[in-house]
Amino acid sequence: MAKIKTVYEKCDVLVVGGGMAGTGAAFEARHWGRDLKIICVEKANIDRSGAVAQGLYAINCYMGMQWDENQPEDHVRYARNDLMGIVREDLGYDMARHVDSTVHMFDEWGLPMMRNEKTGRYLREGKWQIMIHGESYKPIVAEAAKKSADKIYNRIMITHLLMDESKENRVGGAVGFNMRTGNFHVFRAKAVIVAAGGASHIFKPRAVGEGMGRTWYAP
């Protein structure tokens, strides 16, 4: 049996998670911190991990401001109506005003986009979505993260965040293990970005489990 090792790493920015959010965070961290040491840690492999691992057939939101198709105010109005007023309009507006530039960046990186041959505009499916050939979506974004981060650790499952002993209520790193070798990894960082998946089940459940019961005890 191979001896399990403990591996130590120090960095300025530690990104936990290598899905679309994590790879994007690594890219943005490099953009704003040219001289920082950036490490991204992913439990699978960033080339095909996260919710977009298999690709997408559309980008769900694109304003089309350069063609005056929609404006951020339009999207805020849509979200407000859809959610019956329970919405942070400032956050919705902030996301909407940045989405076009992000899509253009994907286009520059080589994501195949469907266009109208006459006008050059992206083809839409409904008011907000634009159509793409998205099988290569995640590998394209992962490549940008590889160029941005100093190190990418695949197959490392982060289990706990570390608290900074010198500063109260401040995270100072994370620990996890390699799912192939069993080695234990300790990451110390000045900043930790947790991009480990969507935030669901953070509320008090009210379901009584009827659906699950019907599944397991079908007639």
Regions found by a protein language model. Give the residues of each.
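Core beta-strand elements of the Rossmann-like FAD/NAD(P) dinucleotide-binding domain
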Residues: 8-11, 181-191
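Glycine-rich loop(s) and the adjacent beta-strand/alpha-helix scaffold that form part
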Residues: 191-219
